[in-house]
Amino acid sequence: VMSDLDFERKHAEDLQRLRGLRLLDDDFMNKVFEDKACAEFLLQIILQRTDLRVQRAHGQHDIKNLQGRSVRLDILAVDEADRVYNIEVQRSDKGAGVKRARYNSSLIDANVTEPGDEYEKLNETYVIFITEHDVLGDGHPIYHIDRTVRETGALFGDESHILYVNAQIKDDTALGQLMHDFSCTSAEEMHYQILADRVRYFKEDTEGVATMCKVMEDMRNEAAREA
């Protein structure tokens, strides 16, 4: 049983860790963007679509693969046109490999269709990796990956999209300012009010801080169980 002293120490460590968390840290990002308005704002900037309206957003969404093993997505959101968005943040390049993007994309396809459904009913999907480093390595702020017909260069049109957003580029564009915000530890330094308010809530508000401490405690317990 954890002693009071031990609990105090762990709690102090959590508070210290919370101060250093950024939107590039998945356990923090999950909480911020499970808020529908924040998820909508994020997608509007990344996809340059001000008309995009999010119906629902879930943080840490568990999705089963065909073997029944559970895979946890950072954020899963659905818009009013039933387009499905998976948003992942990755600090290590290892977790953001191209096969991982393909895997997430196929998982979503397998999970949103019911057996016997028409294939035509497959939702349009976006798998979006926001990476701390320029994983694809060509210096672009954003990379759009779509299947194309090699002979004609035309889009294949299967409505499956993969995007990589490079958080290294923090210029004065809307996306660059968003990436700046993803790299901040304090709400004060952030450009976008909607994100700053939510970050401030989890870092400075008593209730928000308690929520985040609970998240960190749950993660510790889960790690201990899996060890």
Pin down the residues of each PLM region.
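Short, charged alpha-helical interaction segments and adjacent helix-coil junctions
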Residues: M2-R19, L23, D27, I46, ...
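Acidic-basic catalytic patches of nuclease active cores, encompassing PD-(D/E)XK
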Residues: R22-R56
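Short secondary-structure capping/turn segments at boundaries of alpha-helices and beta-strands
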Residues: F28-M29, L42, Q60-K64, R72-I75
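Short, well-ordered alpha-helical segments
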Residues: V32, K36-F41, K99, Q193, ...
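A short acidic/basic microdomain associated with nuclease active sites
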Residues: L52-L66
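Exposed, low-complexity/repetitive linear segments and helix-based recognition motifs
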Residues: G59, V71, Y143, K214-V215, ...
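Zn2+-dependent peptidoglycan hydrolase active-site motif and core
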Residues: K64-R72, L76-D205
